[in-house]
Amino acid sequence: MLEQVRGPADLQHLSQSQLRDLAQEIRQFLIHKVAATGGHLGPNLGVVELTLALHRVFDSPHDPIIFDTGHQAYVHKMLTGRSEDFDTLRSKDGLSGYPSRSESDHDWVESSHASAALSYADGLAKAFELTGHRNRHVVAVVGDGALTGGMCWEALNNIATSRRPVVIVVNDNGRSYAPTIGGLAEHLAALRLQPGYERVLEEGRKAVRGVPLIGELCYQCIHSIKAGIKDAIAPQVMFTDLGIKYVGPIDGHDEHAVESALRHARGFNAPVIVHVVTRKGMGYAPAENDEADQMHACGVIDPETGLPTKASGTSWTSVFSDELISQAAKRRDVVAITAAMPGPTGLSAFRDRFPDRFFDVGIAEQHAMTSAAGLAMGGLHPVVAIYSTFLNRAFDQLMMDVALHKLPVTMVLDRAGITGPDGASHNGMWDLSILGIIPGIRVAAPRDGARLRAELGEALAVNDGPTAIRFPKGDVGEDIPAVQRRDGVDVLAVPATGLTHDVLLVAVGSFAKMALAVAELLRSQGIGVTVVDPRWVLPVPEALADLARDHKLVVTVEDNGLHGGIGSSVSAALRHAEIDVPCRDVGVPQQFQDHASRGEVLAEVGLTDRHIARQITGWVAAIGTRSAAEDEVGQTLD
């Protein structure tokens, strides 16, 4: 049946029985396709019936359907004519793992960072009103904890003041949403703080419990009824107090019920919340039984068991996780913060070992950073573990709430540099540029696991300002020893005997291995190369300037955007030190990179050992030619 669905129009004639069969077919399709490519499996298994209902009720793309977050959009892609492309999911030139405007008119937003859909919806609804398209609805599907982000509530505050037809579907899969909503609970909490409330409540408890034989039972019944009423109506009160109509809760796996609720909501022609309760990983036992995250995201797996098809090596994340626990065991002031990602950022083990010193703030990076500032003010040393790409969201808080106060907060930036399959929104290629303008910050880029352990300890020893440590996604590889240490800078290789000090090659973090390969290629061409790892890349170590004096050319290699990266900082440092040595930087072009494997993206932007060696060979030749020409001019003048 799925093969016959080329677009939403093909869903309109299906009976409820056929829709149930189609839902089952979609789940089997998802399991086998995502098992082969990797991707976000659990979230999409949970929204099958919901997505079917959305496309039967609303006229996409005339009525925009915006997914927050975009990793819930696989079924949407299938129902809009892209099923045949799923073998290429998250592959180079293939189907994106998120909505993609270049793929389909049905994808309005390339949404992958959470909590933004309602703001898009608010803007679109305003635009449709102003341009006379009042018959168009805007649908925002919010789930997977996105409502824990403050931006959602900022948008709701604006949406609620209008009569524009915005339908907000809350996909409540029990992953962070429910505990964050409860208007009546807040009112009751305020009431409990009023003088006399506790006294009257306690007298009432005593009176009921004092009834012979049945008193305690009566009290428990009344207490349960009160709690049930509070839980049942708290969501409605929260939203209706804002001025937004509320429909639900609805069984999200009953397509007919969801469709009826959506049609009802569509008829309001005003802002409305449709509360849909779903189960993440629905219909796939390995996902349903995965207590950690219902197989939120997976690599290549066996579809029958849900287990990875091949063992992975030691990851950067796991090295950080182990070392943080080791440090925390020695230092009671070390605390950890995550923005709804304890597993992916390596903090699950810390949470289990030190539950009182672990804080999951939800999808709230801004709050995470300023909360960390408060923890630091109180005498603790917070470690904020976050994906590099999500650091962008907390820039102001880092600048004004942490750095301005010179607070000892350590940020651990996972997935730094090119990550690959998740595409432009998840590449961590801006963090060095962002951090480079923060006064007083110290930034480390470890080249291997041993350096990650050492630099985490060094960061925790800093008590007069913020620190950051960045590392990439994937396996950490073998340790790379230094041949010598120069005032904190590790020298990894020196020119072979008989070669001059032609090039100082500055390797940033995990690019040290590639830099050594580049040096070997250049050695075979008679070019002498010194390879160094600054370890702490910001501020630029003074020893790096001293090393530069002895070379004809300085080249930096980094997996950050060229604009404002370490190359720019090194060039500025050499100018400041009045060292007149040419400096060239190699990094990621200042443009969004499409999804592909990390290796494919690096090759496409020229970040391979052979390409870099060719570049350096050309630069060295140009410097030699220029020097010869200058000598010739000098002789002529003499």
UniProtKB/Swiss-Prot annotation:
GO terms for molecular function: 1-deoxy-D-xylulose-5-phosphate synthase activity; magnesium ion binding; thiamine pyrophosphate binding. GO terms for biological process: 1-deoxy-D-xylulose 5-phosphate biosynthetic process; isopentenyl diphosphate biosynthetic process, methylerythritol 4-phosphate pathway; terpenoid biosynthetic process; thiamine biosynthetic process. The keyword Magnesium applies. It is an enzyme of class 2 (transferase). Mg(2+) binds at residues 144, 173. Keywords: Isoprene biosynthesis, Magnesium, Metal-binding, Thiamine biosynthesis, Thiamine pyrophosphate, Transferase. It comes from the Bacteria. Thiamine diphosphate binds at residues 71, 112-114, 145-146, 173, 284, 365. The keyword Metal-binding applies. It catalyses: D-glyceraldehyde 3-phosphate + pyruvate + H(+) = 1-deoxy-D-xylulose 5-phosphate + CO2. Binds 1 Mg(2+) ion per subunit. Pathway: Metabolic intermediate biosynthesis; 1-deoxy-D-xylulose 5-phosphate biosynthesis; 1-deoxy-D-xylulose 5-phosphate from D-glyceraldehyde 3-phosphate and pyruvate: step 1/1. Its cofactor is Mg(2+); thiamine diphosphate. GO terms for cellular component: cytosol. Its EC number is 2.2.1.7. HAMAP family: DXP_synth. Homodimer. Catalyzes the acyloin condensation reaction between C atoms 2 and 3 of pyruvate and glyceraldehyde 3-phosphate to yield 1-deoxy-D-xylulose-5-phosphate (DXP). Belongs to the transketolase family. DXPS subfamily. This is 1-deoxy-D-xylulose-5-phosphate synthase. It comes from Mycolicibacterium smegmatis (strain ATCC 700084 / mc(2)155) (Mycobacterium smegmatis). The lineage of its organism: Bacteria, Bacillati, Actinomycetota, Actinomycetes, Mycobacteriales.
